[in-house]
Curated annotation (Swiss-Prot):
<feature type="repeat" description="Kelch 1">
    <location>
        <begin position="25"/>
        <end position="76"/>
    </location>
</feature>
<keyword id="KW-0677">Repeat</keyword>
<feature type="repeat" description="Kelch 2">
    <location>
        <begin position="77"/>
        <end position="129"/>
    </location>
</feature>
<dbReference type="InterPro" id="IPR015915">
    <property type="entry name" value="Kelch-typ_b-propeller"/>
</dbReference>
<comment type="similarity">
    <text>Belongs to the poxviruses Kelch family.</text>
</comment>
<keyword id="KW-0880">Kelch repeat</keyword>
<protein>
    <recommendedName>
        <fullName>Kelch repeat protein B10</fullName>
    </recommendedName>
</protein>
């Protein structure tokens, strides 16, 4: 009987992460981590695991620590929106209005747009090349034409 516990644990026990899959790879991004001093830290990395190739999660640094952010993927690229961020690991948490992109093939990050409102808790989805950013704290939905970013940053068929 399957116990429901994955056999390859992630490197850090953290909560409030955002996760997405691209092909056979799982990305677990940001979140909160409680260190040995019992302090809560916003995580500035993501962990990556190819379920068919990797035996251990690899760690990828993010440009800023993030938690409660939205994430989605298209054409092999990861897109992030909103959430709380901190530029220094022990700095102040701030609402974030960035929409950014990560290319796993090149390990490069790009800022592609900004939401009108700074959003502390968000979800992100893409439908027909339009990104929808859902604000869970203020109840707004913002939409952005994602096609320019998709054309510029990915190896999409467009």
């Amino acid at each position: 009987m399957d116990s429901g516990i994955y056999e390859t644990p992630i490197n850090y026990k953290k909560s409030n992460v955002s996760a997405v899959s691209v092909n056979n790879t799982i990305f677990v991004t940001g979140g909160l981590f409680i260190n040995n001093s019992n302090s809560t830290i916003v995580v500035n990395n993501m962990e990556k695991l190819d379920i068919y190739k990797d035996k251990q999660w690899s760690i990828i640094e993010m440009p800023m620590a993030r938690v409660y952010h939205g994430i989605d993927s298209t054409f092999g690229m990861l897109y992030f929106a909103g959430g709380l961020s901190v530029t220094e690991q022990y700095g102040n948490l701030e609402k974030n209005n960035e929409i950014s992109c990560y290319n796993p093939r090149t390990n490069k990050w790009f800022d592609i747009s900004y939401t009108i409102y700074k959003i502390s808790i968000s979800s992100l989805c893409k439908l027909n090349n339009v990104f929808y950013v859902f604000s869970k704290d203020i109840g707004y939905v913002e939409k952005y034409d994602g096609l320019p970013a998709i054309k510029a940053l990915s190896t999409s068929p467009y």
